[in-house]
């Protein structure tokens, strides 16, 4: 019984550390985040933080994983459920993604900040964020392959996937700048319409060029 309590307490303290680190890193970036600040925000001594994480680099990488799992729970890529109508599938999935971006943004805020930082030695958190993005793009390509069928070749699938993620990034940043001026759900739904038009254009161009 006492072991179970210790484990529960350990998990609870780890969650407090991760939440505090996510808040501070989102406010100050990687360089502005310190163990002392995390200690103050979480109410836990530095020794407790080091018990869970070897150093700040490892902690920030864990924050990326933790915030991604929370975000991903809200926006699963629908591998197996593709609407019969292509355009409906695109607008529905893009609107769902927009809702998730609007509702859970710690992962993207911190991840994009890390991605934009240039350091002599790459931070583990940045590497983790980029790896997650690549895995997400691969899953998105699998979904688009089902949605578009044989309409797009590999290059076309890669292009629409990159466009979808680039628009999501841009809308997120725009919402961070002006949270009253951007309806991410509506904008992402419109991007679904745009992707359908783009796919038709790419297919027609491929047919013309043979």
Each predicted region: which residue ranges?
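Helix-turn-helix
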Residues: 12-16, 20-58, 62
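Hydrophobic alpha-helical connector segments
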Residues: 62, 76-107, 150, 154-164, ...
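Conserved terminal C-lobe alpha helix of the protein kinase catalytic domain
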Residues: 91, 95, 130, 137, ...
């Amino acid at each position: 019984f006492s072991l179970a309590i210790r484990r529960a307490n350990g998990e609870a303290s780890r969650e407090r550390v991760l939440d505090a680190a996510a808040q501070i890193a989102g406010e100050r970036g990687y360089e502005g985040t310190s163990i002392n600040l995390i200690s103050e925000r979480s109410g836990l001594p530095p020794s407790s933080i080091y018990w869970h994480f070897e150093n700040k680099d490892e902690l920030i990488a864990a924050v990326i994983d933790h915030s991604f799992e929370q975000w991903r729970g809200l926006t699963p890529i629908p591998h197996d459920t593709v609407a019969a109508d292509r355009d409906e599938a695109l607008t529905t999935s893009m609107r769902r993604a927009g809702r998730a971006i609007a509702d859970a943004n710690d992962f993207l805020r911190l991840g994009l900040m890390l991605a934009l930082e240039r350091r002599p030695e790459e931070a583990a958190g940045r590497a983790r964020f980029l790896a997650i993005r690549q895995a997400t793009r691969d899953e998105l390509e699998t979904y688009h392959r089902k949605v578009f069928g044989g309409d797009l070749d590999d290059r076309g699938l890669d292009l629409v996937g990159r466009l979808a993620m680039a628009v999501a990034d841009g809308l997120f940043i725009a919402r961070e700048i002006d949270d009253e001026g951007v309806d991410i759900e509506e904008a992402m739904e419109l991007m679904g319409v745009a992707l359908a038009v783009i796919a038709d254009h790419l297919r027609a161009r491929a047919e013309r060029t043979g």
